[in-house]
């Protein structure tokens, strides 16, 4: 099987891959990202790869990472950053509440838990605009 990248005639050496090299894999991702209008790069520092875009029948899914070996590292870094942001928000709320409300000795601040985004590996789904869904036919008079 030959490489699926336009203009390449090299043979694919790894079973299950679509491209002949890792450089051509990133170029293929760039072509797919340009096709659907995504300009985002991988969330990992110093990666430089384009994010993983999977095109379905009527939608396309855009992931936060390129899907290479550092996906778990990206997820942990995002979760740590989200935890720090929520700690800052809770601290600021606590400071505002203590400054504006006079508390009695028996009252305790509520320990409300905020939901963190746990679906890092799940994509954002968008509708494709190049496939007719038939909705426009409903409004033809």
From Swiss-Prot:
Output this protein's name: 16 kDa protein
The source's superkingdom equals Viruses
Taxonomy of origin reads: Viruses, Riboviria, Orthornavirae, Kitrinoviricota, Alsuviricetes
Q: Where is the composition biased (Basic residues)?
A: 102-115
Q: Where is this region: Disordered?
A: 97-119
Native organism: Tobacco rattle virus (strain TCM)
Kindly give the InterPro entries that the UniProt entry links to this protein: Tobacco_rattle_virus_16kDa
């Amino acid at each position: 099987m030959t490489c699926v990248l336009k203009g390449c005639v090299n043979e694919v050496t790894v079973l299950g891959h679509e491209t002949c090299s890792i450089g051509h894999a990133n170029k293929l991702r760039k072509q797919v990202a340009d096709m659907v209008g995504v300009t985002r790069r991988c969330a990992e520092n110093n990666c430089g790869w384009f994010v993983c875009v999977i095109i379905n029948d009527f939608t396309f899914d855009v992931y936060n990472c390129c899907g290479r070996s550092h996906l778990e590292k990206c997820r942990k870094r995002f979760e740590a950053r989200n935890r720090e942001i929520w700690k800052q928000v809770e601290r600021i709320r606590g400071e505002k509440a203590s400054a504006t409300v006079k508390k009695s000795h028996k009252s305790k601040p509520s320990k409300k838990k905020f939901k963190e985004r746990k679906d890092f590996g799940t994509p954002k789904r968008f509708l494709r605009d190049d496939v007719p869904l038939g909705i426009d036919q409903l409004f033809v008079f």
